[in-house]
Amino acid sequence: MEEELQHSHCVNCVSRRCMTRPEPGISCDLIGCPLVCGAVFHSCKADEHRLLCPFERVPCLNSDFGCPFTMARNKVAEHLEMCPASVVCCTMEWNRWPVSYADRKSYENLSRDVDEVAQLDMALALQDQRMLLESLKVATMMSKATDKVSKPREQISVKSSVPEIPHANGLVSVDEESYGALYQATVETTRSLAAALDILNTATRDIGMLNTSVPNDMDEQQNARESLEDQNLKDQDHLYEEEIGAVGGIDYNDTNQNAQSEQNGSSDLLCDLNTSSYDTSALCNGFPLENICTQVIDQNQNLHGDSKQSNLTNGDCVASSDGTSKPSSSLAVAAQLREIIPSSALPNGTVQHILMPDDEGEGELCWKKVDLGDVKNVDVLSFSHAPSFNFLSNSCWSKPKEDKAVDTSDLEVAEDPMGLQGIDLITAALLFCLGDSPGGRGISDSRMADIYHIDVGTQTFSLPSAILATSTMVGEIASASACDHANPQLSNPSPFQTLGLDLVLECVARYQPKQRSMFTFVCGQLFRRKEFSSHFKNVHGDIHAGLNGWMEQRCPLAYYGCTYSQRRFCPSIQGAKIIHDRHLRSFGVQPCVSTVLVEPARNCVLGLHNDHLSSLPFEVLQHIAGFLDGFSLCQLSCVSKLMRDVCGSLLQSRGMVILQWGKRKYPEGNSSWQIKEKVWRFSTAFCSVNEWKFADILSMADHLKKCSYNVVEKREEAIPLPCMCVTRELTKEGRSLRSVLKPVL
């Protein structure tokens, strides 16, 4: 409180027994707290005391989040535990794999009797599948909306700079809606890169002319002494450069050798250890050639102090001179190979097959057997990369290759070998997600062979176009336009019936990497703060952890299609059981109902008697409903309008309030998020289960006696053991089977 509103004496006075007489402008009388909290203070400090009085009624700390209660200040901490606006979101996660094509048939059998038999693991898996399909549908709609907003901007920028040119193949514009913008943007980018490349080539050509005009006096004497051998090596280098194309393949077009080449300014500078001279090897498109023969010849030139500047072209490698001479001896090339490959690593010091120039032919290349035993070791440059034996093969001189889009139909495998014809869209979509996972079969299998990636086609079944037509991984399964283009044999059943996810829950920590095809599900349910601890313990700690065979035990022959299961555990009260509600997406506890109460309920359904519960006074119904948990209140509110009003009167004391936000746009163009409304609802928490007991049920062995899938296969024909497969003379002596099976030492 400001000092001018208080007296000069009262500002610093804190004594309960102050004896100062009240004087105008100096002091005032002592008073006690009107709420009888025990505080005594000067009357001018009454407003200041209200800010600290523990009995002063204040709104809840969560009043901005929707809590309507006001209480004494000393009760705020106690109220926060049951505050309807103190809401906690459960962030528990679990993972599931899509069902592989090998297990598809067995899961179809398990999903056959879902509505008749209540199974916890199946109910949770179907709930996860519905959440997955709904989330993918929302993601698809969001992506389509984004594309519609960004599409006009792209068309405006492209049409302003790129003229419309008719296609050379005589076709009309290729699907302007889907491919026009992408095609025109590609043309625009290509033109921009071409203009930038012309500027770069012009600048680098001028720099190259200045560099080549400077004489190199240090290399003139040595070049004169060994001019004959250098000329032979240069001619050999030119011969190789004329044969090699721009990407390392053979250039069969001899008519383009005199074409004008543009320098790109890239060079590969190699320093010789002996003569300290410099040499620039040929490059194509700014990258060094991967031809081992050219590298060996360049090293041999460095040994003799040759300084040569090769043409650096932006297309095919063009020879620097048109003269031809006899190829150099294969012995010099073998000497270079001797340094790269030690003779100890080869059998008898001999390279069996090496690509060598033919001395007797007309400059042609052939395979020769070269002996490296008598060749002297000379100093050459060592390679820093890992040793590879690719140069021993003829990969450099193979036929030119090209990238081509292929389909799995090129494998010439029988159509639909896995029997997937007629599956529904949901199963096919989840199979599509299973592509790169260890549990599925990918479209292609990527392998590595000596630094080369090889993709081997493995998938031999086709997927419906309704899945691949969308922009998400699985796609919008409920899209009518996509289903129209799908295979007519594919059906589209309700997602509540067919299970396409694995029943087994996988627990992977957040910090651990997950497979791309593994789906992660979050609980995401909202609870009051006092209900969260029991929910996490009972649902995630007890129920989820026991669904893999401990709480919900399935028949051992479930893989073959048996749908029988039994619940081994029940809450502490014998007869109560765990149930799952599909609409609430939550588990709950169904208490044991006496048969005395069940019979009148059946008669009420048949209309033989009136509903006695609805005839009770509203206050009595309100009192009875106060003993129910959130899960039961949600169920009761769906019975009738009267019960809905009864449950609605308990929302402030038993429910929770959730804020719904909405985006508000202003006339200026900006927008902001504001609270649209406050929604009251009950949580799905059930009463806490502190103890679990074994249910009073029959053993699984009793079911196996009458299981229709437990077919005993009787073998009447004797099958000899491996140790008994000997001649009859050894067994005619009457020896026992144990002596026959005794190992022979």
UniProtKB/Swiss-Prot annotation:
Pathway: Protein modification; protein ubiquitination. GO terms for cellular component: cytosol. The keyword Zinc-finger applies. GO terms for molecular function: ubiquitin protein ligase activity; zinc ion binding. InterPro entries: F-box-like_dom_sf, F-box_dom, Fbxo30/Fbxo40, Znf_RING/FYVE/PHD, Znf_TRAF, Znf_TRAF_N. Auto-ubiquitinated. Residues 211-231, 305-324 are annotated as: Disordered. A zinc finger (TRAF-type) spans 48-109. Pfam families: F-box_4, zf-TRAF_2. Gene3D superfamilies: 1.20.1280.50, TRAF-like zinc-finger, N-terminal subdomain (3.30.40.150), Zinc/RING finger domain, C3HC4 (zinc finger) (3.30.40.10). Residues 222-231 have a biased composition (Basic and acidic residues). Keywords: Metal-binding, Ubl conjugation, Ubl conjugation pathway, Zinc, Zinc-finger. GO terms for biological process: chromatin organization; chromosome condensation; chromosome segregation; gene expression; protein ubiquitination. The keyword Cell division does not apply. Substrate-recognition component of the SCF (SKP1-CUL1-F-box protein)-type E3 ubiquitin ligase complex. Required for muscle atrophy following denervation. Part of a SCF (SKP1-cullin-F-box) protein ligase complex. Interacts with SKP1, CUL1 and RBX1/ROC1. This is F-box only protein 30. It comes from Homo sapiens. The gene is FBXO30.
